[in-house]
């Protein structure tokens, strides 16, 4: 969702069961040389590691001249150390580790012409996980009531949505499409193309400190992707998304990434030409294969979302509604099967299934089917909420399909309750619900924009109803509500809502 480019459209803590890591030990796994070394940067020293349950925290001393640090983890299947994340500080936490030994390396990086170059990597860091249990999980067993029949059927999906709490969208940022930038553009050029500043760790920390528990990062991967029919996503683009994902996970929040509008190629799914439809699926598979493989070892607090609002009307073409629903269901099933096939943590990673148009009524239609899944209790459904559209989307009184500059009557509140109650179809079946976007357009008057009357009531009711039903609501924001310059709310009443 783009509301005229202004409304911009995380349990591992546990018993101390680990062993002190061993450094500079005799290697008993292949130790592949990490490429692209920047000789001027020395290897990080003073490395320390601690283990708690199924997570490890690794710290090191600052390296002179470093712009950040790259964390590598050994991948037994690839027999190589692969990049896990890039962080700006001198500490990182990796959660969700399985029982056994895990190997890491740290390298300082500097940024040259927008591209990170890694210095000499550290000696291998060995971390031993004796148990993958967590106190949080045990505590929940002791203090919560027995799950309902529906929650047993689908496992932990409902509890995942509840744990995600209040969410926030990094809107008009990594999903910005800007063909005018040309072939030499950097990821940060796209990041700023729709008017937002470069995302910093301070910004994401401010999101956390403002009361949010999860962050959705819409992404337009096609911005930097090959045009040779192989649909190879640029390593540079991955690196930038890695950084932002790292900011979110380092702040112990859930993180969602997707394929967003992405320039509109989704409409090819609805073409009358079978070859065009087949090419669209080839593209979709190629993109999700790369994304899933790239993030296969990331914490399960990183959630993949199958699509955005385009899955539905934009993929329909001249098909009947029945055929369109079948196509949407097929795309979502392909997404689940493909991600699970890539292994690693993707075997059990929570996956967010985009509803039809992400519209509540259309997604609640019986023709929309949730995919089958080899993992138990890991599927959630995604819908968006911009109703009434004349209030939430329209920003001026001359809007051709109507305009409202206020909200908050009993009729308005009752209509919202009725909409949310439709989603019981999913929670009753044990599926967690994520309202991936909701928001209200500002009122435009000349060149100025002001918040509409009742925006506070709209947000308050979305948050309170979501808490009542166990949904995760995610505010769409492009600095309208949480300024990325000041890292503060733009309206005083927001502090009381979030």
What is each residue range found by the language model?
Residues 138-214:
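N-terminal carbohydrate-binding accessory modules
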Residues 94-116:
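Beta-strand-rich modules
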Residues 194-214, 230-261, 268-306, 328-340:
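An active-site-proximal structural segment forming one wall of the substrate-binding cleft
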Residues 410-495:
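Substrate-binding cleft of secreted/luminal carbohydrate-active enzymes
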Residues 19-40:
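Sec-dependent signal peptide cleavage junction
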Residues 83-89:
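Short beta-strand segments within Ig-like beta-sandwich modules, predominantly Fibronectin type-III
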Residues 278, 282-412, 418-441, 468-469:
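Active-site region of glycoside hydrolase catalytic domains
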């Amino acid at each position: 969702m783009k509301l005229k480019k202004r409304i911009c459209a995380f349990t591992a803590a546990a018993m101390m069961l680990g062993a002190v890591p061993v450094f500079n030990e005799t290697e008993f796994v292949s130790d592949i040389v990490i490429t692209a070394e920047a000789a001027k940067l020395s290897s990080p020293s003073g490395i320390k590691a601690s283990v708690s349950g199924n997570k490890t925290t690794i710290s090191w001393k600052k390296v002179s001249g470093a712009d950040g640090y790259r964390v590598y983890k050994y991948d037994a299947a690839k027999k190589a150390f692969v990049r896990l994340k890039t962080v700006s500080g001198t500490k990182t936490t990796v959660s969700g580790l399985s029982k056994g030994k895990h190997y890491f390396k740290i390298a300082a990086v500097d940024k040259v012409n927008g591209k990170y170059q890694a210095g000499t990597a550290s000696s291998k860091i060995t971390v031993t996980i004796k148990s993958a249990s967590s106190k949080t999980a045990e505590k929940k067993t002791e203090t919560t009531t027995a799950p309902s029949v529906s929650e047993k059927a689908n496992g932990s999906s409902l509890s995942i949505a509840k744990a995600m709490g209040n969410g926030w969208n990094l809107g008009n940022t990594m999903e910005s499409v800007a063909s005018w930038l040309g072939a030499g553009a950097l990821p940060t050029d796209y990041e700023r193309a729709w008017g937002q500043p470069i995302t910093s760790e301070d910004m994401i920390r401010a999101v956390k400190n403002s009361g949010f528990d999860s962050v959705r990062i819409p992404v337009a991967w096609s911005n930097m992707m090959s045009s040779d029919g192989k649909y190879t996503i640029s390593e540079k683009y991955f690196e930038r998304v890695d950084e932002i994902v790292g900011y979110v996970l380092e702040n112990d929040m859930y993180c969602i990434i997707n394929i967003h509008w992405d320039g509109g190629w989704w409409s090819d799914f609805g073409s009358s030409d079978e070859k065009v439809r087949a090419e669209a699926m080839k593209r979709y598979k190629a993109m999700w294969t790369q994304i899933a493989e790239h993030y296969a070892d990331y914490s399960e607090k990183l959630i993949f979302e199958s699509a955005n609002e385009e899955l539905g009307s934009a993929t329909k073409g001249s098909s009947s509604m029945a055929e369109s629903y079948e196509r949407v269901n097929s795309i979502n099933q392909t997404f689940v099967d493909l991600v699970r096939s890539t292994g690693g943590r993707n075997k059990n990673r929570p996956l967010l299934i985009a509803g039809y148009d992400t519209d509540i009524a259309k997604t609640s239609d019986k023709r929309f089917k949730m995919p089958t899944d080899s993992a138990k209790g890991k599927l959630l459904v995604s819908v968006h909420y911009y109703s009434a559209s004349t209030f939430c989307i329209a920003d001026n009184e001359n809007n051709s399909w109507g305009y409202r500059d206020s909200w908050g009557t009993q009729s308005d509140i009752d209509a919202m309750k009725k909409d949310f109650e439709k989603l019981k179809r999913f929670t009753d079946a044990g599926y967690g619900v994520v309202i991936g976007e909701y928001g209200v357009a500002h009122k435009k008057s000349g060149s100025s924009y002001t918040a509409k009357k009742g925006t506070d009531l709209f947000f308050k009711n979305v948050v309170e109803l979501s808490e009542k039903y166990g949904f995760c609501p995610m505010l769409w924001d492009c600095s309208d509500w949480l300024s990325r310059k000041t890292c503060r709310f733009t309206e005083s009443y927001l502090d009381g809502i979030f």
